[in-house]
Amino acid sequence: MSLEIVILAAGQGTRMRSALPKVLHPVAGNSMLGHVIHSARQLDPQRIHVVIGHGADAVRERLDADDLNFVLQDKQLGTGHAVAQAVPFITADTVLILYGDVPLIEVETLQRLLKQVGPEQLGLLTVELDDPTGYGRIVRDADGKVVAIVEQKDADEATRAITEGNTGILAVPGKRLGDWTGRLSNNNAQGEYYLTDVIAMAVSDGLIVATEQPHDAMEVQGANDRKQLAELERHYQLRAGRRLMAQGVTLRDPARFDVRGEVIVGRDVLIDINVILEGRVVIEDDVIIGPNCVIKDSTLRKGAVIKANSHLDGAVMGEGSDAGPFARLRPGTVLEARAHVGNFVELKNAHLGQGAKAGHLTYLGDAVIGARTNIGAGTITCNYDGVNKHKTIMGEDVFIGSNNSLVAPVDISSGATTAAGSTITQDVAPAQLAVGRARQKNIDGWKRPEKIKKD
């Protein structure tokens, strides 16, 4: 059975008080609409139609992709009118309708809903709520069959007492959708074309309305203001934390941990408080991450340790390597097994060989550093001449003295040593000692300057 998906994303979101279209507001580092599209793709539809209106150009620019068909709704005349804009493009047997501001919907929930659809049956996702204020109410007959959905503003007192609410998410036979949207009327309190009226039409046409419910009501929670957006964020993070813990991760405090992307984890991983994982992060077995760390698009091999207040972006830490506290590993950085990066060390596009060490107050950029090499405190690679970047190469078992400036391009061969305080501008051969500093001069009888008296 073929499937197409329609995502409604045309709303203005005035209560957000923002120039940004509502569906582009972020949850866990991705726009709300981005989350919905991600879930939709996992259902393997033949096409995804995104109905856009307010901020249409911004939405299209942010999320444009080959599998998305953006459909413009010039005037926002209701959900039924929005779906009708996509109908001319639909050819599939089944159409699933989703909402661009409902980012937490689970794929498993949608899969259950889709199983309810057939030529003579549609699937409707409903939710039981203690307080259904704002939701359309699911009206059932004496046999428990769904007969209609009544919107809050059109409901009488008895209907408002119903606690089963409409989520708006439904799956319908594709061949019938055009007929139903064509018959919609705006004769209601809002003066809009309600998609919910399709339910009564389906019942009138003799179709069965089968319902499913999410395991968690937050799956179908939308965000109309910043408070609701924050609630979605926190729920997403707690859910992400539970998933990681189920895979063998210890979180010191799941309430102080954020995932903003994709995380692949091994077992016996320990993550302390206030850690943020962004982009695609791979964490192998026995990794330890200290508090207040930000890790983006990085890979941490087995047994790697990141100490407090460190920042990784586009880095790879080898097996048993460690970094921090207060280390910064920028894009292109690779630490081989057992390499050590200490406090206040910054690396960019740098490769540290096995067992290499940079313990303190160091900048290494565009550098290749051999195994077991030791970088003294206060060392920097001078890799930029104002126009081009140049490479510093150090062989194995090199000893770099403290407070060195290594002016690239420069090659320090295996076994070489540089003296403390040196500025190294020339290549150093194997086993050589390089001294690149002024000779010390001691002056006898030196008299310190006296303080000038002010008038």
Swiss-Prot record:
GO terms for molecular function: glucosamine-1-phosphate N-acetyltransferase activity; magnesium ion binding; UDP-N-acetylglucosamine diphosphorylase activity. It is found in: Cytoplasm. GO terms for biological process: cell morphogenesis; cell wall organization; lipid A biosynthetic process; peptidoglycan biosynthetic process; regulation of cell shape; UDP-N-acetylglucosamine biosynthetic process. It catalyses: alpha-D-glucosamine 1-phosphate + acetyl-CoA = N-acetyl-alpha-D-glucosamine 1-phosphate + CoA + H(+); N-acetyl-alpha-D-glucosamine 1-phosphate + UTP + H(+) = UDP-N-acetyl-alpha-D-glucosamine + diphosphate. Residues 1-226 are annotated as: Pyrophosphorylase. Pathway: Nucleotide-sugar biosynthesis; UDP-N-acetyl-alpha-D-glucosamine biosynthesis; N-acetyl-alpha-D-glucosamine 1-phosphate from alpha-D-glucosamine 6-phosphate (route II): step 2/2; Nucleotide-sugar biosynthesis; UDP-N-acetyl-alpha-D-glucosamine biosynthesis; UDP-N-acetyl-alpha-D-glucosamine from N-acetyl-alpha-D-glucosamine 1-phosphate: step 1/1; Bacterial outer membrane biogenesis; LPS lipid A biosynthesis. Its main location: cytoplasm. Mg(2+) binds at residues 101, 224. In the N-terminal section; belongs to the N-acetylglucosamine-1-phosphate uridyltransferase family. In the C-terminal section; belongs to the transferase hexapeptide repeat family. The keyword tRNA processing does not apply. Homotrimer. Catalyzes the last two sequential reactions in the de novo biosynthetic pathway for UDP-N-acetylglucosamine (UDP-GlcNAc). The C-terminal domain catalyzes the transfer of acetyl group from acetyl coenzyme A to glucosamine-1-phosphate (GlcN-1-P) to produce N-acetylglucosamine-1-phosphate (GlcNAc-1-P), which is converted into UDP-GlcNAc by the transfer of uridine 5-monophosphate (from uridine 5-triphosphate), a reaction catalyzed by the N-terminal domain. The active site is at residue 360. Residues 227-247 are annotated as: Linker. Its EC number is 2.7.7.23, 2.3.1.157. Pfam families: Hexapep, Hexapep_2, NTP_transf_3. Signal peptide: none annotated. Keywords: Acyltransferase, Cell shape, Cell wall biogenesis/degradation, Cytoplasm, Magnesium, Metal-binding, Multifunctional enzyme, Nucleotidyltransferase, Peptidoglycan synthesis, Repeat, Transferase. Its cofactor is Mg(2+). Acetyl-CoA binds at residues 377, 383-384, 402, 420, 437. Residues 248-455 are annotated as: N-acetyltransferase. Binds 1 Mg(2+) ion per subunit. This is Bifunctional protein GlmU. It comes from Pseudomonas fluorescens (strain ATCC BAA-477 / NRRL B-23932 / Pf-5). Disulfide bonds: none annotated. It is an enzyme of class 2 (transferase).
